[in-house]
C-alpha cells in the first residue's frame, strides 16, 4: 500500500460513485457512505444494511477491505451489493490507498 497510486485509486473509485458517496457528511446512497471507511466498524453508518453485513464483526481494516473488494459476495454471502469485485491486486491496492485519504485523520499504513 505504501507504493500504491492514489490518483489511480480515485479512477477505480469512479466505478463506485453510482452507489456510494465519498465526501464527508454526504450520507448514504444505494450503498453506505465510504468517507472515513478505513478502520471504521463494519455496518456502523446510517444505512439499511443486509443481514449479511449486519452479521459482520470487526473493522474495515486493510485486510478486510482487500478481501471484500476482491469478491464482495464471497466475503459477505447474501449481500445486496451487486458489484462483482476488483480482481486486479494493483487496482485494489490503489483503491484502498485512495479510500484511506478520505478522512480527516487517515489510518496508519500497515
Residue spans for each PLM region:
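N-terminal post-signal-peptidase region of extra-cytosolic proteins
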Residues: 1-2, 18-21, 48-49
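C-terminal capping alpha-helices of c-type cytochrome domains
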Residues: 61-110
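Electrostatic cytochrome c docking/interface patches
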Residues: 1-13, 110
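Short phosphate-engaging motifs
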Residues: 18, 26, 91
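Gly/Gly-Pro-rich "capping" loops immediately C-terminal to redox-active cysteine motifs
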Residues: 6-10, 24-62, 80-85
